Amino acid sequence: MSAMLNENVPVEFQEAHGYAAREKVVLRMRGRSWTVRLKHTKGRRPRRERAVLRYGWHRFCADNGLAVGDTCFFRALRSAGSGAGDVDDGDGDHVLSVTVHKADGGDPLE
């Protein structure tokens, strides 16, 4: 499980969703929610910060039985408490719906 303590957020995704200004995201899967803190580090390119899912990511992995080789798919949803839809309006917590495809070929976890 130690290999799964951090998860890098692709630069394109973090720029599209304003992660430079965010401190946390909420992951939703199987009717449950996990708050995960973002750690920001300077990237190798000038003015390109990197966001990493840190504190809370390990709990998400453990609670869902994730293993090395499993693939997580994230879909950005509207901020928590702002109604239905697929657009983040910048208010409140940024919510990501998660689907996991297990490396062993089992049914996806949603």
Swiss-Prot record:
UniProt feature coiled coil, ranges: none
Chief location category: nucleus
SMART domains (UniProt xref): B3
DNA-binding region: 1-104
GO molecular function: DNA binding
Pfam families: B3
One GO term describing the cellular component: nucleus
InterPro entries referenced in this protein's UniProt entry, alphabetically: B3_DNA-bd, DNA-bd_pseudobarrel_sf, REM_fam
Entry keywords, A to Z: DNA-binding, Nucleus, Transcription, Transcription regulation
Gene3D superfamilies: DNA-binding pseudobarrel domain
Domain of life: Eukaryota
Cell compartment(s), UniProt: Nucleus
Name by which UniProt lists this protein: B3 domain-containing protein LOC_Os02g10420
Organism (species): Oryza sativa subsp. japonica
